[in-house]
C-alpha cells in the first residue's frame, strides 16, 4: 500500500517570545512579525512591545496568545467590562473607539486592494455608535456544569466553547442586561434545564421578547415557570423545539419603529442589533439610491423589509427577495400594515440564482438595486447584476472579505463611486460598510 509522506507539525516554542505590534487587521487583531512571518495577537495596540506564547505556526503566519504588555501604547484604555479578558463578545475594549474605526477602514481598504484589485479612496463618512448599551438583541449560551451541578448562563469564552458567567453586559440595553441574573435563576429552576440550548433576548419599541431554544418539549411545570417569568418581566415568550419558533402563550406582537414605520418581527428573525446605526444606514441607502416616483427598485436579501418599506414611500415600486418563507410573509404583512401597496415580496434562494432565470421578478427591469447579504456574500447574484442595466446599485456588507470578492464581479458593468463605514458593533471586529455603484 502506498504511504504518503506527512510532515510532522513544527514544534511550538515552549518559552514566551517578544514581538512588536506593527498594525491591526480588519478584525482588530494585532499583527507583528515572528521569524519573518505575520504573527496575529488579540488584545494589543499598534506600537506595543508584548510577550506572547505562540499557539499555532503555519508556513506564512503564526497565532499567539498575549501574556504581557511590556511597553504599552499611550492610547491603551482600561476595559469597562469586568469580564472583558475572558468573554468572547468584545475583543477591543482596550482600544479607543476612533482607533477601532480607523483600523476597520484600513482593513477594508487593504482587503479590496488584495482581493479585488480595487484601490478604495477614503470613505465618504465613518459613522460611529454609542460605546455602550447599543445592542437590542443578544444570544445567551446555556450549559450544564457537572462540577458546579448547575446550569451556566452567559457568553462563550474567547476562542473556546467554554462559558463565561456574567451578571450584566454593558453593551446590551439596560433592560436586557438586567434580565441575565433572573434568567439564570429561572433556568436552574427548570427540571428540563439541561435541554435548554440557548436564549435570545430582544428589546424594541414594543417591549421585551425572549426566544428559548429547547431540545424537547418542556413539562407542564416548566411551562408554568416560564410563563410566570414572562408575566413578571412583561416579556413576549417564544419556544423553539424544531422548526420555526412559536409563542408559548398569547403574546403581544413584537415590532420596532423605523422612519415612522412599524416593522413587525418574531424572535428568530434577523434584526439589526444597533437601532441608531440602523436608522443611519437606512438614511444613507435612501440618499445614495435617490429613488424617484418613477423608479422601480429591487431589494435583494430583504428580510422583513428593513430597507424595502422606507424605499417604497419614495419609489414607484419595490420588489423584495428573501430566502426564508416566514420572513417573506412578515415583510408582506409589514407592507400591508403600513399601507404600502407598491411592494411585492418573493422567496428565492439567492445562492442558486440560475434556478430563478424564468421567475417573473428576474424578468423585470429595475432602475435601482439594493442588496444586503449575510456574511457569505452574494457571489451568485453579481454576474446577473453586472448585466442588469440598473442605474445605481448599493451594496450593504457585514463582511469585507466577501464584499471585495462581490464588488470585483460588478466591475464589467459598473463603477464604484463612493463608500462609507458604519461601526455597528463597537469593540468587536465586525464592520458594516456601504458601497455605491453607477452604471458605466
Swiss-Prot record:
UniProt-listed Enzyme Commission number(s): 2.1.1.190
Gene3D superfamilies: 2.40.50.1070, Nucleic acid-binding proteins, Vaccinia Virus protein VP39
InterPro entries: 23S_rRNA_MeTrfase_RlmD, MeTrfase_TrmA_CS, NA-bd_OB-fold, SAM-dependent_MTases_sf, TRAM_dom, U5_MeTrfase_fam
Transmembrane domains' residue ranges: none
Catalytic residues identified in the record: 398
Annotated GO biological process: rRNA base methylation
Gene Ontology MF terms: 4 iron, 4 sulfur cluster binding; iron ion binding; RNA binding; rRNA (uridine-C5-)-methyltransferase activity
Disulfide bonds: none
Pfam families for this protein: TRAM, tRNA_U5-meth_tr
Keywords: 4Fe-4S, Iron, Iron-sulfur, Metal-binding, Methyltransferase, rRNA processing, S-adenosyl-L-methionine, Transferase
Catalytic activity reported: uridine(1939) in 23S rRNA + S-adenosyl-L-methionine = 5-methyluridine(1939) in 23S rRNA + S-adenosyl-L-homocysteine + H(+)
Function: Catalyzes the formation of 5-methyl-uridine at position 1939 (m5U1939) in 23S rRNA.
Name by which UniProt lists this protein: 23S rRNA (uracil(1939)-C(5))-methyltransferase RlmD
UniProt source species: Tolumonas auensis (strain DSM 9187 / NBRC 110442 / TA 4)
Gene: rlmD
Amino acid at each position: 500500500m502506498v504511504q504518503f509522506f506527512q510532515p510532522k507539525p513544527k514544534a511550538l516554542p515552549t518559552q514566551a517570545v517578544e514581538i512588536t505590534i506593527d498594525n491591526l487587521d480588519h478584525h482588530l487583531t494585532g499583527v507583528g512579525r515572528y521569524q519573518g512571518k505575520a504573527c496575529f495577537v488579540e488584545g494589543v495596540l499598534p506600537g506595543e512591545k508584548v510577550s506572547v506564547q505562540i499557539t499555532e505556526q503555519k508556513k506564512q503566519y503564526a497565532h499567539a496568545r498575549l501574556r504581557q504588555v511590556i511597553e504599552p501604547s499611550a492610547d491603551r484604555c482600561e476595559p469597562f467590562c469586568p469580564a472583558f479578558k475572558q468573554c468572547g463578545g468584545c475583543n477591543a475594549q482596550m482600544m479607543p473607539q476612533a482607533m477601532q474605526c480607523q483600523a476597520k477602514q484600513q482593513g477594508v481598504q487593504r482587503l479590496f486592494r488584495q482581493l479585488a484589485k480595487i484601490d478604495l479612496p477614503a470613505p465618504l463618512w465613518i459613522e460611529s455608535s454609542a460605546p455602550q448599551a447599543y445592542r437590542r438583541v443578544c444570544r445567551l449560551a446555556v450549559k450544564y456544569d457537572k462540577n458546579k451541578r448547575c446550569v451556566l448562563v452567559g457568553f462563550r469564552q474567547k476562542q473556546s466553547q467554554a462559558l463565561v458567567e456574567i451578571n450584566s453586559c454593558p453593551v446590551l440595553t439596560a433592560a436586557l442586561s438586567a434580565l441575565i441574573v433572573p434568567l439564570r435563576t429561572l433556568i436552574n429552576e427548570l427540571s428540563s434545564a439541561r435541554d435548554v440550548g440557548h436564549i435570545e433576548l430582544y428589546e424594541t419599541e414594543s417591549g421585551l421578547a425572549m426566544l428559548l431554544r429547547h431540545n424537547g418539549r418542556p413539562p407542564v411545570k416548566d411551562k408554568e415557570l416560564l410563563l410566570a417569568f414572562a408575566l413578571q418581566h412583561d416579556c413576549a415568550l417564544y419556544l423553539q423545539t424544531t422548526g420555526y419558533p412559536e409563542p408559548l402563550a398569547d403574546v403581544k406582537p413584537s415590532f420596532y419603529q423605523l422612519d415612522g414605520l412599524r416593522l413587525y418581527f418574531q424572535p428568530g428573525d434577523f434584526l439589526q442589533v444597533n437601532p441608531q446605526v440602523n436608522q443611519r444606514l437606512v438614511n444613507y441607502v435612501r440618499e445614495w439610491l435617490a429613488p424617484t416616483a418613477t423608479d422601480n427598485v429591487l431589494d435583494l436579501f430583504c428580510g422583513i423589509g428593513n430597507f424595502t418599506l422606507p424605499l417604497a414611500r419614495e419609489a414607484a415600486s419595490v420588489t423584495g427577495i428573501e430566502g426564508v418563507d416566514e420572513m417573506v410573509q412578515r415583510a408582506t404583512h409589514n407592507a400591508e400594515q403600513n399601507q404600502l401597496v407598491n411592494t411585492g415580496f418573493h422567496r428565492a434562494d439567492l445562492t442558486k440564482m440560475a434556478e430563478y432565470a424564468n421567475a417573473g421578478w428576474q424578468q423585470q427591469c429595475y432602475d435601482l438595486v439594493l442588496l444586503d447579504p449575510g456574511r457569505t456574500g452574494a457571489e451568485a447574484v453579481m454576474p446577473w447584476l453586472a448585466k442588469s442595466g440598473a442605474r445605481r446599485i448599493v451594496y450593504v456588507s457585514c463582511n469585507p472579505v466577501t464584499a471585495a470578492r462581490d464588488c470585483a464581479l460588478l466591475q464589467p458593468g459598473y463603477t464604484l463611486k463612493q463608500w462609507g463605514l458604519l461601526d455597528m458593533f463597537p469593540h468587536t471586529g465586525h464592520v458594516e460598510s456601504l458601497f455605491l455603484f453607477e452604471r458605466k
